[in-house]
């Protein structure tokens, strides 16, 4: 099992009251036993101590944690019998039959990454929080099957227009919009991308 940027608390509201979570926490997700946790950058909604403690502190299992420098330093504070891997841009990791590769992202954190995951014959690209930046495309292969891209347009993330341009340039077969509905009331149906799949909160999607 792979978990990416888990945020299952209301930690951010303590810093900014406007960023209260609009969706309740599904506590069943706190009981997941991940093999790999990926944190794409060092912001509280991506490296959340209140969430990570369930996966790293309250377990005797060994978990692989992949994170760029600043996020890695935060996650590593949990200690335990875990493998904390500093996963900066152009890093790679193989866990079983799953391959991970980190790529450039453009965000307000100093060390953000996107992640490409190759599993079961498909390539999944998680952009992480990012703005549109031409340099990113140097890292992206031309055979992405599924891409996950932010659309909220605040906090140094792409808006829907830029996310559509970005998706078209990547050329992924399927595009999943993310970073909506948690701190805002965005309607993902306003994301005008023909090959999009809109997920429902806490529901499995087949991509």
Model-derived regions, located:
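Binuclear metal-ion centers of metallo-dependent hydrolases, dominated by the metallo-beta-lactamase
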Residues: 79-93, 138, 143, 162-207
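Pre-active-site segment of Zn-dependent metallo-hydrolases
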Residues: 2-38, 50-54, 131-142
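Metallo-beta-lactamase
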Residues: 34-46, 60, 66-121, 175, 195-207
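Active-site environment of divalent metal-dependent phosphoester hydrolases
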Residues: 10-11, 43-47, 72-74, 91-94, ...
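Active-site-proximal loop/helix segments of hydrolase catalytic cores
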Residues: 50, 106-169
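A short helix->loop->beta-strand "cap" motif at the edges of active sites that frequently abuts
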Residues: 58-64, 170-174
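Structural motif
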Residues: 2, 35-36, 98, 122-124, ...
């Amino acid at each position: 099992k792979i978990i990416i940027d888990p945020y299952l608390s209301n930690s951010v509201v303590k810093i900014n009251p406007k960023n209260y979570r609009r969706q309740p926490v599904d506590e069943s997700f706190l009981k997941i036993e991940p093999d790999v946790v990926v944190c794409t950058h060092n912001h509280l909604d991506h490296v959340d101590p209140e969430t990570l403690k369930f996966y790293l502190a309250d377990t005797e299992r060994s978990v692989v944690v992949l994170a760029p420098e600043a996020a890695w330093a935060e996650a590593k504070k949990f200690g335990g019998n875990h493998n904390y891997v500093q996963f900066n841009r152009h890093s790679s990791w193989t866990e079983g039959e799953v391959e991970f590769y980190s790529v450039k992202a453009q965000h307000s954190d100093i060390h953000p990454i996107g992640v490409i995951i190759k599993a079961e014959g498909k390539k999944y690209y998680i952009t992480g929080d990012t703005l549109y930046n031409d340099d990113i495309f140097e890292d992206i292969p031309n055979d992405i099957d599924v891409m996950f891209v932010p659309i909220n347009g605040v906090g140094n993330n792409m808006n829907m227009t830029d996310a559509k341009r970005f998706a078209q340039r990547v050329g992924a077969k399927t595009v999943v919009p993310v970073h909506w509905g948690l701190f805002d009331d965005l309607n993902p149906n306003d994301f005008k991308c023909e090959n999009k799949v809109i997920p429902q909160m806490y529901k499995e999607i087949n991509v």
